[in-house]
Design a protein with these regions (language model features):
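Cys/His-rich short segments
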Residues: 1-24
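Phosphate/pyrophosphate-binding loops at sites that engage ATP/ADP/AMP, CoA/4′-phosphopantetheine
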Residues: 170-186, 338-354, 375, 410
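Glycine-rich active-site loops that engage anionic ligands at enzyme catalytic sites
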Residues: 29-72
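Short coil-to-beta-strand transition motifs
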Residues: 17-28, 79-84
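Condensing-enzyme catalytic core mediating Claisen C-C bond formation in acyl metabolism
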Residues: 118-161, 273-331, 335-342, 347
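Short nucleic-acid-contacting surface segments enriched for D/E, G, S/T with interspersed K/R
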Residues: 69-89
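Conserved catalytic cysteine-centered active-site region
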Residues: 154-162, 194-256, 262, 370-402
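OB-fold/S1-family single-stranded nucleic acid-binding modules
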Residues: 81, 89-121
Length: 426
């Protein structure tokens, strides 16, 4: 965020400056330099590029750091990257001690034509109203960096990323995709089990950066209800029905609700107890906007089941989760996924052949394929949602990212069954 002003007189009009948010805009890297010996707070970044970025055809200039860029030992010709277009990214500002507040900034930058290309944010007025609520828009964010092993790739965060930054980026993409006015979002849920804070919500940061709800500029607050949820890997999907119900309930006065699943999935080193998880953990987030207008996927029904099954856990103050070995399979994952999917199909009087797509929680490659086959689904029904092979197990983002992949190609009147799972268990 910065101020737009006249380069000659220093005023916008009538002696007032205009408050502008550049987070959705595209700029140009005018000049830059390489910081080869960062100060203590930036040491973990290594050498990085710092420059001047201009917006609005050079009328506004701000300093900024180029992120997602690893400088090699060889010299980089700065003239090759100057004058290239860049887009703002939400990142950690610099490294701090474990007990400190994490500083963030929405004006770190990446090149506009790389990985996540620039997309214009255009607010569209609500048009058609549906009888039942559903998904209005969605967005997925995963890092550009990967670790590839055998048949799986795992997304890993850059040094200035975490579950908070991924949540903001996914929410931003959902707003761009839907065209929804951020001020009309009255509720935001963020589900995660890797919040960098033990006590401090992610949702409040998302609401502030994305300007969700009516903005009270004088007080610096957003008129939105923001809350974090936690239930292992189903922390986000469990809020789908709550978000949809709120937009349907007339006296709630909530036109739209946003649900985000975000995780920087954790695992112990491979030579320690619980280290088997490290073969599959990934990083990413997905965001869905629910409402009654311009619905792209209606919510037809749901079913949930829960049991106190200790198949996966992390005790307070412990850095890594533990799991119950083979106990995480039949008595936990498979039982709950199969039970919920069968009961929902029974409730809606559907057979697997009546559905076009099936997506479920994806802790690895084998589990979702096995449960899909046991339920009677064919490969063409579940393969498109199997995103664990590209990004790893993104925990709270896993089945939602699979759903987003299916929505990318699904056609009108096709049916999708989503069966999420959270260890603990439900």
């Amino acid at each position: 965020r910065t101020k737009d002003y006249c380069g000659k007189c220093g005023r916008k009009s009538f002696g007032k400056m205009q408050d502008i948010d550049f987070f959705y805009e595209k700029g140009k890297l005018e000049v830059c330099t390489i910081v080869k010996e960062p100060t203590n707070k930036f040491t973990k970044l290594g050498a990085y590029i710092y420059g001047i970025i201009s917006f609005h055809n050079g009328k506004v200039r701000v300093p900024g750091r180029l992120t997602d860029h690893i400088l090699k030992d060889e010299e980089l010709a700065l003239s090759c990257i100057e004058d290239r277009e860049v887009v703002p990214r939400f990142r950690r500002r610099y490294a701090v001690e474990q007990s400190d507040i994490i500083p963030t900034i929405s004006l770190a930058f990446t090149f506009a034509d790389e990985y996540y290309p620039y997309q214009k944010h255009e607010v569209v007025k609500p048009n058609k109203k549906y009888e039942t609520p559903g998904i209005v828009g969605y967005g997925v964010y995963v890092s550009k960096f990967r670790i590839k092993e055998d048949s799986i790739e795992r997304s890993i965060p850059f040094m200035d990323e975490d579950s908070i930054t991924a949540a903001v980026e996914a929410g931003k993409l959902a707003l761009i995709h839907s065209g929804v006015d951020p001020s009309l979002i009255g509720k935001v849920y963020v589900g995660s089990e890797s919040n960098p804070y033990a006590v401090k919500p992610i949702a409040s940061k998302v609401a502030q950066v994305l300007k969700l709800g009516e903005e009270e500029k004088s007080d610096g607050v957003q008129g939105v209800d923001a809350v974090d949820t936690e239930f292992a890997c189903k922390a986000a999907t469990s809020m789908f029905k709550d978000a949809a119900a709120l937009t349907y309930y007339p006296t709630a006065h909530i036109p739209y609700a946003m649900v985000i699943g975000t995780d920087n999935s954790q695992a112990a080193p491979r030579d320690e107890p619980g280290g088997e998880l490290d073969f599959f953990v990934g990083y990413g987030a997905s965001a869905f906007i629910f409402g009654m207008h311009d619905v792209i996927a209606e919510l037809e029904g749901w079913y949930s089941c829960t049991s106190d099954t200790p198949d996966f856990w992390r005790r307070d103050l412990e850095p890594y989760p533990r799991h119950g070995g083979r106990f995480t399979g039949e008595p936990a994952y498979f039982k709950h996924i199969a039970k919920s999917a069968k009961k929902l199909m029974e409730k809606l009087r559907l057979q697997p052949s009546d559905l076009d797509y099936f997506v479920c929680h994806q802790p690895n490659i084998r589990f979702p394929i096995k449960v899909a086959k046991e339920l009677g689904f064919k490969e063409e029904q579940y393969i498109d949602g199997l995103q664990v092979v590209k990004f790893g197990n993104t925990y709270s983002g896993a089945s939602p990212i699979g759903l987003a992949a299916i929505l990318d190609k699904a056609k009108p009147n096709q049916r999708i069954l989503v069966a999420s799972y959270g260890s603990g268990a439900g």
